[in-house]
């Protein structure tokens, strides 16, 4: 499974690393890629560092981690240096460019995989829906598309977003957009890597419940990832 992380968090907690670790715990090999730092946001890379999980330095190292059943986060600078240089243009121009969208739909594996993708503005929903429905090569695998939680591809712990599943051009709604959850979980501060890491560890240790929206997202990912792998064999 491919899990991009390029937005980070400013106000809400960045729980994309939790999503990754829950999936790995369920036996799904996950390649997570993204930026390591953002001057205005808390990145997944910083949270992994706070968790004591080292970043993969190469594609081969990331593959070894996945084979060993470990979380594999690789910086985009190690995975695709030329794309990383284009992303750096954001700091110069002050706005995101098309590379920011392209990197989120990247599928780096030779074999089919499940991609988690997100959008932040309605026009990107239309564009990405058209791509996955009509243009994306079927042999590259399936994709989930959802409105990002501050841009990230993890479900909003306070309010589940709609998730669309694209498989061989067919679109299926897996999760409908929901109202604010009745039981809103206590979440860590969005800009604090150490507090977020502690909170994630408490969830993984069973001292806190997994937010319902994320638990449901994990279940869907496990199910569809298994279907994709079955089609490979």
Predicted segments, located by residue:
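A generic, well-ordered mixed alpha/beta core segment in the N-terminal half of proteins
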Residues: 1-65
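Glycine-rich anion-binding loops and their surrounding alpha/beta cores
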Residues: 50-53, 61, 66-233
């Amino acid at each position: 499974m491919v899990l991009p992380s390029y937005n980070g968090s400013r106000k809400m907690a960045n729980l994309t690393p939790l999503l990754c670790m829950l999936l790995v715990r369920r036996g799904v090999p996950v390649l997570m890629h993204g930026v390591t730092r953002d001057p205005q946001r808390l990145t997944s890379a910083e949270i992994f560092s706070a968790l004591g999980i080292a970043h993969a330095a190469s594609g081969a190292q990331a593959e070894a981690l996945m084979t060993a059943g470990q979380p594999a986060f690789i910086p985009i600078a190690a995975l695709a240096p030329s794309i990383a240089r284009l992303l750096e243009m954001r700091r110069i121009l002050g706005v995101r460019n098309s590379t920011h969208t392209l990197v989120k739909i990247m599928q780096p594996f030779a074999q089919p995989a499940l991609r988690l993708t997100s959008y932040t503005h309605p026009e990107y929903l239309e564009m990405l829906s058209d791509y996955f429905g009509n243009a994306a090569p079927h042999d590259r695998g399936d994709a989930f598309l959802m409105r990002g939680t501050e841009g990230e591809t993890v479900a909003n712990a306070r309010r589940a977003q709609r998730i669309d599943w694209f498989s061989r051009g067919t679109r299926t709604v897996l999760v409908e957009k929901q109202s604010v959850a009745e039981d809103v979980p206590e979440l860590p501060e969005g800009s604090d890597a150490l507090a977020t890491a502690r909170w994630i560890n408490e969830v993984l240790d069973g001292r806190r419940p997994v937010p319902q929206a994320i638990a449901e997202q994990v279940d869907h990912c496990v199910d569809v990832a298994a279907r994709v792998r079955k089609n490979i064999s």
